[in-house]
Every structure is written in structure tokens, then in C-alpha cells.
Amino acid sequence: MNIYKLALAFATATLSLSAVCGELEDGFKNPPADAEPKASQEATGDVAALKLQNDAALLAGKDDIACNPAWPGAKELIRYVARCRYLFRASKAADKADAGRTFKDGTVGFFATHPTDKQSAAVSLDFPVTGKHPELWDPATGRILRPSKSSEAGGRTTVVWNADPGASVFVMFRPQPSSAKKAPKILASQIQDVEVTGTWDPEPTPDTAFANKTFRFSEGLFRLPGYATMAWIDLGKAKGVFEIKVNGKKFPTLWKPPYRLNIADALSFEADGHSTEPGADIGQQAELNVELKANGSFGTITWQAICD
């Protein structure tokens, strides 16, 4: 586990959480009507690189963002920046390290980033806060979760954040517990590869750049050796922007690592087992129809799952 002292944060200010984020049940998926900032310059690289550039600008207290509004994925990137800016509006880089931002309802908030875009990690973040209830607010998805683990000692609180490569998070310490769900603790040893039948049309070529090209996977049978709690499609080493539909369900645009989606919500599993003998191979199976719209390059597509 990596230990990070939070060295980047924001000066104290007062701003109503409800004015920025709405009620907790709505997450913070809907910023105020004026929250869509205008892009100030053209895109100069892939979205993941722009995200890191924007993170740096936000931490430095700058308002400019790098994004071409006509570029695929620009809407998601602009929404991401809007969430960041409007949550910490009127703030600037703090003179004192790990100074948080205090809101009118007593919530104290911090902003942190995972420094690498190469691998996921369980990151331990250390904050000068006690007696409050920590939550992890994901600006990329709008989800609000309780950390999988947290502890208090010596006037500080340590929060474990299961961070994806290059991810950012708001760590919010609330005065009262909320209905936020606990973040799942996913171990690499739990994830297993899944064999899927069927073919792509056309067959994608790994590490080849595509512009607005659609690939379809159909007539496949997604079969699992147990009962799935999560099921993923993984685009491997990818760069660019990708839109994915599974069995007609549209998922959030992928524009930064990890280029992986949990598609379990789009799968209607049925029991798969025809024997009552001890040790029989009983699991789940589901039809699988995928539409992948690619603006960029991706690696070998794989399927993974966590099964009970």
C-alpha cells in the first residue's frame, strides 16, 4: 500500500454544498446551469493527457482548461472540470500544506490525484481531520462512496482510496453519516479472465488508430464459472475516446485509464448447470451484444469478472 501525505489542497472558504452539488441522493452529477465552462484553447493531445493538464491547472487555481468542444469526449471532459471548479469555486492553492476547505454545513473537503497513469493502487491518504465521516466523491462519474477503510490516530484521519490510474477524487469529511455506499475492495487475485464466444465485425486490429469507427460484437455467450458480482470489458493499452453499448445499454464514455467498464448491469444472467453431481460446473451465462465506437487506438480486448 502506498502512503501519501496530502500536499495539494485548497484555502478555507464558505460555500453551500447544496448550491453546488444538490442533494446527496443526486450525487453531484448536475452542477448549476451555468457550470459548463467554455473551452479556452484547442486540444493538443489525448484526453488522458488533457485531464492531467487540467488537474494541474485546477490545483494551481487557474480557470483555463484545454479542450476542443468539437472533439469526441469533450462534453465529458468539460463536465469533469465543471464539477472540480464548482465544488472548489473561488478557492486558490493553500499556503499551508494539507489545508482543507470548510463548507457551511461543517463538511471539510480535499482534492487528491493518483500520480501515475500506469496502474491502480490502494492509496492511503492522511488528513488533519477527526470526528467526521469521510466520503470519496469521484468527479469523473459523479459517484459518492464511503472509503473501504479509514482510521483515526494522533489528531488525523487516514483514508484508503482504491485509485485507478491517473484518477482524481474529492475526499469529503461530513459532520453526519450519509447513505453513501461503501467502496468495494477489489483485489487483483479476485479478478479472473473469462472466455467469450463470438466474433467482432469488423475484426479490430490492436494498436491501430481509428477515427469514428464502430465495431460490433454479437452472437457471443458470456459464460461465468460462478455468480458474478462484477464483469468487465477491458480495452487494454488504449488512447483516445470510446463509446460502448452492451445489449443496448449505453455506458459512460471512456476517455482516460483504465479503459475498462463494469458491464454487469447490462447482462441478464441465467443459471448454467445441467448436472446435480458433486463438483458439477455450475455458473451463469448471458447473451452479449457490444457496440464499440472508437476514436483512438486500443489493445487486445479482454473480458474479466469477479465471481463468488
Walk through the language-model features, giving the residues of each:
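Gram-negative bacterial Sec-dependent N-terminal signal peptides
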Residues: 2-20
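Carbohydrate-binding surfaces of carbohydrate-active enzymes
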Residues: 22-212, 225, 295-298, 305-308
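Extracellular and analogous surface-interaction loops
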Residues: 103, 114, 127-128, 213-229, ...
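Aromatic-lined ligand-binding clefts that engage carbohydrates, nucleic acids, or primary amines
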Residues: 126, 221-250, 255, 288-291
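A short acidic/small-residue loop/turn micro-motif
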Residues: 152-153, 176-177, 252-260
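Short, well-structured beta-strand segments enriched in hydrophobic/aromatic residues
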Residues: 168-174, 229-231, 282-292
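Membrane-proximal, cysteine-centered motifs at transmembrane boundaries in secretory-pathway
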Residues: 236, 242-243, 253-270, 274-277, ...
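Noncatalytic modules at the cell exterior or secretory-pathway interfaces
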Residues: 267-272, 278-294
